[in-house]
């Protein structure tokens, strides 16, 4: 938010389900960062997102997004485990890529430092799917 204030522009940050988001009018740009589009695992839902974005964009507006590819999920992350121990906490990140469905599941266990000095353990399962570049363009 500090960067927004420094920019001098009125930037509206929203957190909504991208399959159902609503705006108060049209905008010049929509930005979806950090591979958010990979959370959309169904082609119909991705089409819904694209239609919503198109609906809220100015005629010359731009939609900026990034997506991880099948190559990244299969070859780089694959069925691997990544673990790190940092000053503020630790994590264990287990990946499982299903070749048949194209679904990648992150089993993420976080150990976060509490003010008491104890560590708090949380666990999240994150499901993501790469979308074929040609399919995405055709939608």
Question: Whereabouts are the PLM-identified features?
Answer:
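Conserved SAM-binding loop
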Residues: 1-4
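Conserved SAM-binding strand-loop segment of SAM-dependent methyltransferases
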Residues: 6-23
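Generic enzyme active-site microenvironment
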Residues: 15, 33, 64
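Short catalytic/ligand-binding loop motif for oxyanion handling, primarily in non-cytosolic enzymes
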Residues: 22, 38-40, 71-75
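Residues lining hydrophobic/aromatic ligand-binding pockets adjacent to catalytic sites
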Residues: 22, 32-33, 47, 69
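A short SAM/SAH-binding and catalytic strip from SAM-dependent methyltransferases
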Residues: 28-45
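A short glycine-rich, Lys/Arg-flanked "PGG" loop and its adjoining helix->strand segment in the class I
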Residues: 47-62
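SAM-dependent methyltransferase
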Residues: 64-135
């Amino acid at each position: 938010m500090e960067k927004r204030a420094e920019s001098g522009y009125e930037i509206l940050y929203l957190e909504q389900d991208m399959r159902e988001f609503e705006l108060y009018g049209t905008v010049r740009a929509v930005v979806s960062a950090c591979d958010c589009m990979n959370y959309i695992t169904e082609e119909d839902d991705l089409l819904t997102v694209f239609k919503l974005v198109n609906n809220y964009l100015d005629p010359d507006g731009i939609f900026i997004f990034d997506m991880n590819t099948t190559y990244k999920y299969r070859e780089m992350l694959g069925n691997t485990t990544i673990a790190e121990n940092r000053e503020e906490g630790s994590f264990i990140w287990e990946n499982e890529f299903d070749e048949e469905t194209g679904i990648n599941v992150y089993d993420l266990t976080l150990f976060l430092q509490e003010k008491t000095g104890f560590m708090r353990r949380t666990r999240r399962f994150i499901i993501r799917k790469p979308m074929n570049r040609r399919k995405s363009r055709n939608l």
